[in-house]
């Protein structure tokens, strides 16, 4: 078996939950529902969900019905909100929702009609839904021009109960919070329109990680942190006590000394400027190591940075370890996270990788592929 793996520190996950809980102030603290979409941001949703459930979190959120089913099959009993709102054009998606006791998000009249017909057919009494409204994101959610028809459809189907009202904030991590404040104003207007139809949601929610850390007015009844649970602050300087949860490591499987002027890798994009020692490591872009790190990124060996030499391949990556004294076969190589070694202590963060590859830390985490096995630590 190759030595490449992702180590998930569940103690850090619990720590981050407590940090976020402590940051919620006021007479009525909102509930934290953890967002575990995309396999819990690459950390492994079942194990993360079990840890959060034991830690007392009151609910979870996912994007897809398939993600919710995976958690139910793993034995998770918490309420699970299916935020994507796509259940297929027929009724079978809603049948799964009801059978597995999930909380559906809806945003158009057709969804409500289909769900109501399933509830009547299965004689389930009432099923609670969360209505998503679009206040400025422009993706999913009932738009202002549609909201009257959607609310009227809900009002005429008593078997579908408006349990929650939600929206998604587009710019909560921006320097200027003007857009977010306007979204919250529109959300308040829609809540009042719902009440005019006799619909009063039990809970309201809008805050993602950035909003819950920056805008107390957006906290409402539930907050939905995602990336912050995994130790990534959505805004520089916010929540400095968060701890990264995942660490990606491998080992040196080959060492080679090459002459000055030799070229290596696909396209021969790296040329030795001196006699050099090159280490080969069994991790590549198929594992989530971005090809954009070719000749730009680095890894940690013996606690010291070693530059990536040449193009990142599908399964393998080469490092220039000429300046890493004592590098040898079997040495640990860390591509993401912290390493303590005989030459010092080093850290490569998801934010650093994102900066080098022109993306965001969210993508760095979710790009770690499933062929990289997750190992869970309880220090």
UniProtKB/Swiss-Prot annotation:
Mind telling me which InterPro entries this protein's record contains? Ala_racemase, Ala_racemase/Decarboxylase_C, Ala_racemase_C, Ala_racemase_N, Ala_racemase_pyridoxalP-BS, PLP-binding_barrel
Pathway of action: Amino-acid biosynthesis; D-alanine biosynthesis; D-alanine from L-alanine: step 1/1
Q: Which GO terms describe its molecular function?
A: alanine racemase activity; pyridoxal phosphate binding
Q: What are the BP-aspect GO terms?
A: D-alanine biosynthetic process
- Keywords assigned by UniProt? Isomerase, Pyridoxal phosphate
Catalytic reaction annotation? L-alanine = D-alanine
Which cofactors, by name?
Answer: pyridoxal 5'-phosphate
Entry's CDD domains? Answer: PLPDE_III_AR
Q: Where does substrate bind?
A: 139, 314
The terms describing its cellular component in GO are: cytosol
Q: Which domain of life is it from?
A: Bacteria
EC code(s) of this entry: 5.1.1.1
Entry annotation: catalytic residues:
37 (proton acceptor), 266 (proton acceptor)
Residue numbers bearing the N6-(pyridoxal phosphate)lysine modification: 37
The answer on whether this UniProt entry bears the keyword Isomerase reads yes
Against PANTHER family, the record matches this protein to:
ALANINE RACEMASE (PTHR30511), ALANINE RACEMASE, CATABOLIC-RELATED (PTHR30511:SF0)
Q: What family, per the record?
A: Belongs to the alanine racemase family.
State the function annotated in the UniProt record: Catalyzes the interconversion of L-alanine and D-alanine. May also act on other amino acids.
User: What protein name is recorded for this chain?
Assistant: Alanine racemase
Question: From what organism does this protein derive?
Answer: Sorangium cellulosum (strain So ce56) (Polyangium cellulosum (strain So ce56))
What taxonomic classification does the UniProt entry list for its organism?
A: Bacteria, Pseudomonadati, Myxococcota, Polyangia, Polyangiales
